[in-house]
């Protein structure tokens, strides 16, 4: 069997759509699984949109996702002379002809058309969709060269596939109609027709094509929002394919080993932002503990805290932690609590602000719901008295105090006001772990302040 060669052939516009990058992922995995070549072709014939900046955005997205290509980047604009030479061949063989056409703007010019066969059936076996067929008479002749002399997508695409020796074309099923036309061009040129695999589209929860109206639709947006490239890669792979069991989080090596085009789903794949966020959280959990801890330390610097020093691992609200080993242990404990709960890397500084500074915002809705209720002030002051007597300031000891107060009726009436009083938020890491991290002095001071300024009598 000859070497398998696949290509990703986007038209750079400055933004890379998740549907396009999923096609790149499938092409890349197929090449790696079969030991073939993954080629990158930049279809840059739209000179207004395919700027150097737009092309660089494409490269950056692919490198961020680990989609490395095997040969020099192929630029379609550099092959225009060859495209037109092939058009001349088609004209000479009678497979193309020139005709005068008037544009929508009223301009008249000569357009080169491809002559479709008038009888017979165009057929191919799609690796994903199965046998596909269409009567030749149902497809009209189509343009391959504009009146300005520039080659159109159909001819450029086929010629470049021939020149790059592409054996398999894996692309979206919005190209199925183009494929019938392209097969006719391949045959007219006496070239071998590649194998095709058309991928189902990505849809929203209403079954319509996923677009920016449904949320982030471009790779760059996910990068800015704190998604890990491994998570986005993994999730997009599963939009139309699975390993044959219930595994969802896979290593890159497992993906390469297991990926087969024959297992790609025929039906449309629904994009679920919540599932992607969950997967991102799973990949965040895989970050080495020390690495994640140091991310937190650095992010604390953005909150104006002296805790941002990696050298000292300072803990500005805990002067009682005098030894470096104690401070590192404090950061390790905080990181462990946050790492298992966080879904995104953006906003880490904000999520730990209450641990590194007394200057943190209060969520007004949480204050209204949890603190501005009758009896909350007395509840907080009672807790201050009880917490003052705790000898071992640890999560288990503090939880025992609240459990005793609740008398088996649930700790919610105490837990929620305490959380808002000491952190300004209605959610976060475990409350008693939070109190252990804040330490005795900070916890008691914040409870007193909330009782005096925020809580209702």
Label each region the model flagged.
Residues 27, 58, 90, 114, ...:
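Residue-level signal for inorganic ion chemistry
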Residues 146, 164-175, 203-235, 239-248, ...:
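Conserved phosphate-binding loops in nucleotide/dinucleotide-binding enzymes
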Residues 1-101, 106-108, 137, 177-191, ...:
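N-terminal Rossmann-like or analogous alpha/beta NTP/dinucleotide-binding catalytic cores
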Residues 391-455:
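Charged substrate- and nucleic-acid-binding regions of tRNA-handling and nucleotidyl-transfer enzymes
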Residues 289-300, 313, 317-406:
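Small-residue-rich helix-loop
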């Amino acid at each position: 069997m000859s070497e398998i060669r696949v290509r990703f052939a986007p038209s750079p516009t400055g933004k890379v759509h998740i549907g396009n990058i999923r096609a790149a992922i499938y092409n890349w995995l197929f090449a790696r699984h079969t030991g073939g070549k993954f080629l990158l072709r930049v279809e840059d014939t739209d000179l207004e949109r395919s700027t150097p900046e737009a092309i660089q955005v494409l490269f950056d997205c692919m490198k961020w996702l680990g989609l490395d290509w095997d040969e020099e980047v192929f630029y379609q604009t550099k092959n225009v002379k060859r495209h037109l030479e092939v058009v001349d061949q088609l004209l000479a063989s009678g497979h193309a002809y020139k005709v005068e056409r008037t544009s929508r703007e009223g301009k008249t010019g000569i357009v080169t058309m491809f002559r479709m066969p008038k009888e017979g059936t165009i057929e191919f076996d799609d690796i994903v969709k199965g046998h596909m067929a269409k009567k030749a008479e149902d497809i009209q002749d189509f343009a391959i060269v504009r009146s300005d002399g520039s080659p159109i997508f159909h001819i450029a695409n086929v010629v470049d596939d021939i020149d790059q020796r592409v054996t398999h074309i894996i692309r979206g099923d919005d190209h199925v109609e183009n494929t019938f036309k392209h097969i006719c061009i391949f045959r007219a040129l006496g070239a071998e027709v590649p194998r095709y695999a058309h991928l189902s589209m990505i849809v929203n929860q209403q079954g319509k094509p996923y677009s920016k109206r449904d949320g982030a639709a471009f790779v760059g947006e996910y990068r800015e929002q704190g998604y890990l490239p491994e998570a986005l890669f993994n999730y997009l792979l599963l939009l139309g394919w699975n390993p044959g069991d219930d595994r969802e989080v896979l290593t890159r090596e497992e993906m390469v080993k297991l990926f087969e085009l024959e297992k790609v789903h025929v039906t449309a794949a629904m994009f679920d932002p919540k599932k992607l966020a969950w997967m991102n959280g799973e990949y965040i959990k895989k970050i080495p503990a020390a690495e994640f801890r140091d991310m937190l330390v650095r992010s604390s610097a953005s909150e104006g805290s002296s805790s941002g020093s990696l050298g000292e691992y300072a803990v500005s609200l805990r002067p009682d932690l005098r030894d470096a080993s104690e401070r590192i242990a404090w950061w390790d404990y905080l990181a462990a609590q946050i790492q298992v709960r966080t879904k995104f890397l953006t906003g880490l500084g904000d999520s730990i602000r209450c641990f590194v500074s007394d200057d943190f915002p209060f969520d007004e809705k949480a204050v209204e719901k949890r603190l501005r209720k009758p009896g909350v002030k007395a509840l907080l002051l009672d807790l201050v008295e009880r917490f003052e007597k705790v000898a071992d300031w640890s999560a288990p000891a503090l939880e025992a105090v609240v459990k005793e107060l609740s008398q088996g009726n649930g700790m919610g009436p105490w837990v929620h006001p305490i959380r808002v009083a000491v952190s300004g938020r209605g959610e976060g890491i475990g409350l008693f772990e939070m109190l252990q991290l804040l330490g005795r002095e900070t916890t008691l001071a914040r409870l007193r302040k909330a009782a005096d300024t925020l809580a209702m009598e």
